[in-house]
């Protein structure tokens, strides 16, 4: 929560199922719901949805909320507490979704196969909303990569 809400240019766009007056209120609400299933080791999920700079003009706060909620539905992250926070610390538009993996009925929201589902859902939403598709590895900001991705891109550059 500190990373998502603590940044200077962070804006809480939407909250559902939590008191959103302060960061502490949000944390208390998440903890109360997480106590319905204390065996779950990682009760909070975090997803960052990043978009191309090319899409910035059409990504209003309302559109970012709509895309985040649609993403959550497609990923089966429903019936639970969540917040959507927009960061404006980078040139590309992006939001962070923080959600309780214990739903409102005490059931665990699975994170199984998330990487595969995430890829499919992102492609679907980009196509549906006419968002920019990067043309492969050429658009990657290599100076910002960390290992092991940095080495992968160095190899890619050397081989091509």
Name every feature range the model reports, one short phrase each.
Residues 1-160:
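N-terminal nicking endonuclease/strand-transfer module with a His-rich metal-binding environment
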């Amino acid at each position: 929560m500190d990373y998502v809400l603590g940044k200077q240019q962070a804006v809480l766009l939407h909250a559902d199922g939590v008191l959103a007056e302060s960061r502490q209120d949000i944390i208390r609400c998440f903890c109360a719901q997480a106590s319905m299933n204390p065996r779950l080791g990682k009760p909070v999920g975090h997803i960052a949805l990043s978009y191309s700079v090319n899409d910035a003009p059409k990504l209003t706060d309302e559109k970012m909320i709509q895309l985040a909620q649609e993403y959550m539905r497609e990923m089966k992250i429903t019936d639970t507490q969540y917040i959507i926070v927009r960061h404006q610390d980078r040139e590309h538009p992006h939001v962070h979704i923080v959600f309780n993996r214990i739903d409102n009925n005490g059931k665990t929201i699975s994170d199984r196969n998330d990487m595969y589902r995430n890829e499919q859902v992102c492609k679907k939403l980009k196509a549906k909303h006419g968002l920019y598709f990067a043309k492969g590895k050429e658009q990657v900001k290599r100076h910002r990569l960390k290992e092991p991705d940095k080495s992968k891109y160095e190899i890619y550059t050397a081989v091509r």
